[in-house]
Amino acid sequence: MNAPTDYLLHLADNALILGQRNAEWCGHGPILEEDIALSNNSLDLIGQARMLYQHAAAQIGGEATEDTLAYFRDVPDFRNYTLCELPHMPLMSATAQGDRDFAMTMARNFLYSSLMVLVWDQLQSSKDPQLAAIAAKSLKEVRYHLRHSRDWLVRLGDGTDESHTKAQAALDQLLPYTQEFWASSPHEAEALANGTGIDIAALRNDWNQIVDEALLEATLQRPADGGFVPTGKQGIHSEHLGFVLAEMQSLARAHPQAVW
């Protein structure tokens, strides 16, 4: 049994867009080790996206490939969490798209990987055998992503006054976006019904425990969830996704028939 195509695209789009964001640190890391670590994180995520796009393309048929799904869909076609597409800087600051705040990046990676260790763990039991195999491989990678981002969040939160302030500001901005994790979507409901997906809302307590334990160690305060629920996985995105796709897709769209 195959998972619904839109469900596969949702998982793939999350990995691709966050992988693309983390790749923006290549050559700009605060220290060489972190430059390499974030580049490797990006490669892991894009590798996960490739496997999922290949699986989805096989179901779609025709001329669909992993490349057409990554490079020739437009903003409304993407089903990623809004959290994954946000820039690396506070949204209200007067900065350019290319500016980077390390605390923002680590906070986002922590919040996302805290979810995905739970998601991939459960998807190992999916009735879609190919998705289950992808989950088993991805789980090993995202466990490292969680450990890496958690260590940095604790280091920043329990560090200097400046690093604590930056970590708290990042958390205050990003954590409300995680409300989208638990909002229902048609493709998730369909995948759950046919046994290929999981009940994402059932993971909320375990995710909260992972987050709260880390914040306690980091001496950070958890902000209120807020009432706004982002709608990225329904195809309604922030303005930031357009900038990500414009850069990521430019070469493929300029030379659509090129063979590399």
List PLM regions with ranges.
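Conserved alpha-helical segments that form or flank metal/cofactor-binding pockets of metalloenzymes
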Residues: S42-F78, S149-V154
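Acidic/His metal-coordination segments adjacent to aromatic residues that form catalytic metal sites
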Residues: M1-D6, F72-R108, L156-H164, L174-G197
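Internal, conserved structured core segments that host functional sites
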Residues: L83-H148
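Helix-loop segments that flank and shape redox-cofactor active sites
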Residues: L18-N40, M116-L131
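Amphipathic, well-ordered alpha-helical segments in soluble domains
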Residues: N14-N22, Q48, L52, Y112-V119, ...
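Domain-scale activation on soluble regions of proteins
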Residues: R21, H55, T82, D121-L123, ...
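Alpha-helical scaffold segments that form or flank carboxylate-/histidine-based iron centers
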Residues: P4-L8, G29-Q48, T105, Q130-V142
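Extended, helix-rich structural scaffolds rather than catalytic motifs
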Residues: T165-W260
